Structures are given as C-alpha cells and as structure tokens.
Amino acid sequence: MKKLALGLCPLLMLGGAACKKSEPPPPPPTTAAPTTTLPPAPSVGGVTLGNAIGADKKVSAPSEAFGAKDTIYASVDTAGTGHVKLRALWSFVKGEKTAKVDETTIEFESMGPATNEFHVSKPSGWPKGDYKVEIFLNDSPTAAATRSFKVG
C-alpha cells in the first residue's frame, strides 16, 4: 500500500498542476484618449493710439498726446477664433469724473490674429485735458484694455 501511495503521489502532483487555472492574460496597454485641441477663444492683444493709420489698420506713429484738431485712432489687435464683438468707449476724464465722448461697436468672425481700428474726431477741436479709450470684448462689463491720452 505504501508503494501504491508513493507511486500515486507524482501522478497527483502532475494532475494538480494540469488542473490549475491559468492566470488571465494581462490587460492590453492603455492608450491615451486622443486630445482635442480647441481653437483659442477670441482675446484682445494690444491697443495702440496714434493720429494716423496704415492700410493694415495699424497706427503708423504711436502717441499718447494729441492736438486739438487730430483724429485719434485706436488700433486693436485681436487673436483667437470665433465671433467677436469689440466696443470702444471714448471718455473725457476730469479727476474721478468721466464724460462719454463716443462709443462704437464692431462685430466680425475672427479666423485668427487681426487688427481693427476705432477713431474719433472733432473738427471744431478737442478740449484740452485727459481722455481714455476702453476696449470691451463680447459684452464683458470689464474692459479688456484701457489706454489714457492727453489733448493739448
């Protein structure tokens, strides 16, 4: 009987190994989901003031001081894609008080970097003093850019 038990031992060991469940294969390596790059939202880059612009709508000679009869240009650089609504609010500034001089809005579909212009003129002459132009983007209550300038 002892010999039979000893003879069965190796067979049982082999049988046990054959019945052993194999481990599941490792999961396939994960791949990162493809990233979708959204185009940048419209934004205001720079605002340059001057009394003349070129065909590219850029101010030819930047200035922050103007004569009483000057036409004052604000060249506004934008970037990004999508619908853009730019509003220029020109104001006379005296201490803490401001008085609106002019307000102009333009709308366009932006396909990338662009330059737009706003301007104000007063043929009878600007009163001497401090002024500012605020550029608003897409109905935001906060100006995207503000530039101050003097007349006189």
Annotated model-derived regions:
Residues 38-128, 134-147:
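Contiguous segments within soluble domain cores/interaction surfaces
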Residues 29-37:
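Extracellular mucin-like PTS domains
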Residues 18-22:
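Bacterial signal peptide processing site
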Residues 1-17:
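Sec-dependent bacterial lipoprotein signal peptides
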Residues 1, 28, 93-97:
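Serine/threonine-rich low-complexity intrinsically disordered regions
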Residues 23-27:
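Ser/Thr/Pro/Gly-rich low-complexity linker/stalk segments immediately outside membranes or between
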